[in-house]
C-alpha cells in the first residue's frame, strides 16, 4: 500500500528541487489525488492519506505576485503540470506565517505532540461538510475540484479551530473565506 496506506499525512519537503525519475509516478499521484486510489498491478488500492507539498520560492514572493507571467508554482518540476496543481486543495503562503523564534516558544506547559496527533487523527474521521452547507452556498460557478477543495479545507479548519464542533456563523464565514482564498491561489 505504500506510505499513503499507512499514514494520515504524507509530506514532500523541498519540492522545488524534486526530480521525477519515473514518469508513471505523476500519473499515479494524479489518480490518487483525484480518487483516493491507485493501481498496483491489477489491484486497486484505496487510501485516505493527505498529501502535503512543502517548498521554497526561488525569488522574492513580491516579484512573483507582481508579475503576471509568473506563478507561485514555478519552483515545481515541469512534470507537475496543471492537472496535478489543480488537484491541490489549498496554497498556504509561508511568507504569511511567522518564523519560529524564542518569542513564540513557552517555558510553561504545552501540548504533548503525541496526544495532539491522536486528537487530530480522531478528528479526521469526522465530516464537517454539513456545517458549511447548512449556512452557506457556493456560487454556481464554483464546481468540481474547486468546490471539493473549498469544502475539504473548511472541514479541516473547523476541526482544527473548533474541535468541539460548535462555531458561530461568523466563524464559519471566516473559515470559508480563508478556504476560498487558498483555493484561488491554486488557480
Residue ranges and their predicted role:
Residues 3-15, 87-98:
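P-loop NTPase motor core
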Residues 6-32, 46-49, 56-67, 83-84:
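Conserved AAA+/SF3 P-loop NTPase catalytic/coupling segment centered on the Walker-B
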Residues 26, 66-70, 105-109:
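Short secondary-structure boundary/capping segments
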Residues 1, 34-49, 65, 72-80:
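Conserved Walker
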Residues 39, 53-56:
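A conserved active-site cap/scaffold subdomain adjacent to cofactor or substrate pockets
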Residues 65-99:
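A short helix-turn-beta junction within AAA+ P-loop NTPase domains corresponding to the substrate/partner-engaging
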Residues 89-187:
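Conserved NTP phosphate-binding and transfer environment spanning the P-loop NTPase/kinase superfamily
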Residues 3, 21, 25, 80-84, ...:
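Helical mechanochemical/support elements of P-loop NTPase systems and associated helical scaffolds
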Amino acid at each position: 500500500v505504500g506510505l499513503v496506506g499507512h499514514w494520515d499525512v504524507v509530506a514532500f519537503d523541498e519540492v522545488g528541487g524534486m526530480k521525477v525519475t519515473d514518469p508513471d509516478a505523476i500519473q499515479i499521484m494524479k489518480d490518487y489525488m483525484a480518487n483516493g486510489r491507485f493501481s498496483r498491478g491489477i489491484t486497486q488500492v484505496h487510501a485516505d492519506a493527505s498529501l502535503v507539498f512543502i517548498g521554497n520560492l526561488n525569488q522574492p514572493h513580491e516579484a512573483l505576485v507582481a508579475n503576471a507571467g509568473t506563478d507561485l508554482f514555478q519552483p515545481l518540476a515541469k512534470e507537475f503540470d496543471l492537472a496535478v496543481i489543480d488537484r491541490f486543495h489549498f496554497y498556504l503562503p509561508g511568507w504569511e506565517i511567522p518564523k519560529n523564534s524564542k518569542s513564540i516558544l513557552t517555558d510553561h506547559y504545552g501540548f504533548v505532540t503525541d496526544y495532539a496527533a491522536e486528537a487530530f487523527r480522531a478528528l479526521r474521521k469526522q465530516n464537517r461538510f454539513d456545517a458549511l452547507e447548512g449556512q452557506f452556498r457556493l456560487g454556481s460557478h464554483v464546481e468540481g475540484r474547486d468546490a471539493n477543495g473549498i469544502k475539504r479545507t473548511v472541514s479541516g479548519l473547523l476541526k482544527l479551530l473548533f474541535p468541539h464542533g460548535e462555531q458561530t456563523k461568523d466563524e464559519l464565514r471566516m473559515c470559508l473565506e480563508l478556504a476560498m482564498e487558498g483555493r484561488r491561489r491554486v488557480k
